[in-house]
């Protein structure tokens, strides 16, 4: 069994970028900054250029190939959409590959030398000033963290990110509903180190954990609350679902009890053969957050429908490559149900008992009969085959139902837990 010190020593190697990666990142960053500087000069845009995010604070993970560059507008009369239009024209003229992305407002994502560089316009604000767009806070976030995090703590941020990535809770997008990069940095800044974050998290309780860097009376309804030091009316942990928070609590407890390098390795556990049904849809041409949000809602409604039909669902989830398909996966007790089911009625002394009995008098059922104090019938199921049940609910459409072919994460042994 490895000691905590041995595991951390090995894990630190996994989260430290090579000198070559550092040089390449800096080279691409400077290249795009120069292009943006030329563009804002050409079009007379009053702005400052800032590199923010993990690449600017040395909290990025090896292999990460994305950079965030902000155009901080100093003139609020400038429309962000106009800036995007001018920049897209500029990059097109110079043969730079770009695509339009959307958050609260549009921004550009460039592909430069194998790196994805997000170019995000925002307005310049001061501490205590209300943001005009969500992106306006980013320069202030950067300033706060640069002042708070030591070099050792930045290394611990990288460790925490890989830990969270391994257990599946890293990322604030709807796909994950987990911890954002900014949130991981705040946790290390607040508690002091990677181990101290885990020790604290092992004592967290959902809906009773409130973290703030200064006195705050703001109220939030969320499993975890971390008040933004830049905007006291904002919960940085708003995206963290109950499941993600609870997964992190469990992983923290288990790692501290039995440290292992498995918490920092992207591995797959063995497939456990069980009954599983998968509904596969073609991937729509829409932003990922829209797609994940929609199919999570559809997935929940299908889960409820399967329960109504008598199929016991052990667990379910949504998976996608965000290119060609999106799937709803259900791990179930049975694919085929027996033709008859026991249906419980009201107690014999309840006023509703007469209506229940009369409903089934002329039906092809066993009963009505009394068991204990209740009336029951044994009646024929509407659906015995899970595919028929799904087709009725989903109707005609462009989807495929696959039975017992899925071998993804939902039917695998947990590879990291110790």
From Swiss-Prot:
EC number assigned by the record:
2.7.7.72
- Annotated Mg(2+) binding lies at 66, 68, 118
Name what cofactor the protein needs.
Mg(2+)
Question: For this protein, what reaction is catalysed?
Answer: a tRNA precursor + 2 CTP + ATP = a tRNA with a 3' CCA end + 3 diphosphate; a tRNA with a 3' CCA end + 2 CTP + ATP = a tRNA with a 3' CCACCA end + 3 diphosphate
Top-rank taxon of the source lineage equals Archaea
GO BP, one example?
A: RNA repair
The UniProt entry, under Gene3D superfamilies, shows: Beta Polymerase, domain 2, CCA tRNA nucleotidyltransferase, domain 2, Poly(A) polymerase predicted RNA binding domain
InterPro entries in the record, alphabetically? CAA_C (IPR048833), CCA-adding_arc (IPR008229), CCA_tRNA_nucleotrans_2 (IPR042090), NT_2-5OAS_ClassI-CCAase (IPR006116), NT_sf (IPR043519), NuclTrfase_I-like_C (IPR011068), Polymerase_NTP_transf_dom (IPR002934), tRNA_NucTransf2 (IPR015329)
Q: Is this entry keyworded tRNA processing? A: yes
- Give the residues the record marks as binding CTP: 54, 57, 141, 161, 170
UniProt binding sites for ATP: 54, 57, 141, 161, 170
Its keywords, alphabetically, are: ATP-binding, Magnesium, Metal-binding, Nucleotide-binding, Nucleotidyltransferase, RNA repair, RNA-binding, Transferase, tRNA processing
- Any other noteworthy remark? A single active site specifically recognizes both ATP and CTP and is responsible for their addition.
Report the protein's function: Catalyzes the addition and repair of the essential 3'-terminal CCA sequence in tRNAs without using a nucleic acid template. Adds these three nucleotides in the order of C, C, and A to the tRNA nucleotide-73, using CTP and ATP as substrates and producing inorganic pyrophosphate. tRNA 3'-terminal CCA addition is required both for tRNA processing and repair. Also involved in tRNA surveillance by mediating tandem CCA addition to generate a CCACCA at the 3' terminus of unstable tRNAs. While stable tRNAs receive only 3'-terminal CCA, unstable tRNAs are marked with CCACCA and rapidly degraded.
NCBIfam families per the record? Answer: cca_archaeal
Assembly and partners? Answer: Homodimer.
UniProt-recorded name of the protein? CCA-adding enzyme
Give the organism the record lists.
Pyrobaculum islandicum (strain DSM 4184 / JCM 9189 / GEO3)
Gene that this sequence comes from: cca
């Amino acid at each position: 069994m490895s000691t905590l010190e041995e595991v951390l020593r090995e894990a630190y190697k996994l989260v430290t970028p090579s000198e070559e990666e550092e040089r390449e990142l800096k080279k691409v960053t400077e290249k795009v900054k120069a292009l943006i500087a030329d563009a804002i000069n050409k079009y007379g845009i009053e702005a400052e250029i800032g590199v923010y995010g993990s690449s600017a604070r040395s909290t990025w993970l090896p292999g990460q190939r994305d950079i965030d560059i902000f155009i901080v507008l100093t003139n609020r009369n400038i429309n962000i959409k106009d800036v995007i239009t001018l920049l897209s024209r500029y990059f097109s003229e110079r043969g730079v590959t770009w695509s339009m992305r959307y958050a609260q407002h549009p921004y550009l994502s460039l592909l430069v030398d194998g790196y994805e560089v997000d170019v995000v316009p925002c307005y310049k604000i001061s501490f205590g000033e209300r943001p005009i767009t969500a992106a306006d806070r980013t320069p202030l976030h950067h300033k706060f963290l640069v002042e708070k995090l030591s070099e050792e703590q930045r290394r611990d941020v990288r460790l925490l990110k890989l830990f969270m990535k391994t257990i599946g809770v890293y990322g604030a997008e709807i796909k994950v509903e987990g911890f954002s990069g900014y949130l991981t940095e705040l946790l290390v800044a607040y508690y002091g180190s990677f181990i101290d974050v885990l020790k604290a998290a092992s004592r967290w309780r959902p809906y009773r954990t409130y973290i703030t860097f200064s006195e705050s009376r703001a109220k939030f309804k969320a499993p975890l609350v971390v008040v933004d030091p830049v905007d006291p009316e904002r919960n940085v942990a708003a995206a963290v679902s109950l499941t993600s928070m609870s997964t992190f609590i469990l992983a923290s407890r288990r790692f501290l009890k039995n440290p292992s390098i498995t918490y920092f390795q992207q591995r797959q556990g063995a497939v456990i053969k069980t009954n599983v049904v998968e509904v596969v849809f073609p991937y729509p041409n829409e932003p990922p957050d829209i797609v994940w949000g929609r199919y999570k809602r559809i997935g929940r409604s299908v889960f409820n429908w399967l329960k109504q039909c008598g199929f016991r669902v052990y667990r379910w989830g949504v998976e996608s490559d965000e290119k060609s398909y999106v799937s709803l996966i259900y791990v179930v007790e049975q694919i085929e149900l027996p033709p008859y089911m026991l249906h419980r009625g009201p107690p014999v002394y309840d006023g509703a008992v007469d209506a229940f009995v009369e409903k089934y008098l002329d039906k092809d059922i066993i009963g009505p009969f009394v068991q204990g104090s209740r009336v029951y019938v044994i009646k024929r199921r509407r659906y015995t085959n899970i595919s028929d049940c799904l087709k009725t609910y989903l109707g005609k459409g462009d989807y495929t139902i696959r039975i017992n072919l899925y071998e993804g994460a939902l039917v695998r042994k947990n590879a990291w837990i110790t």
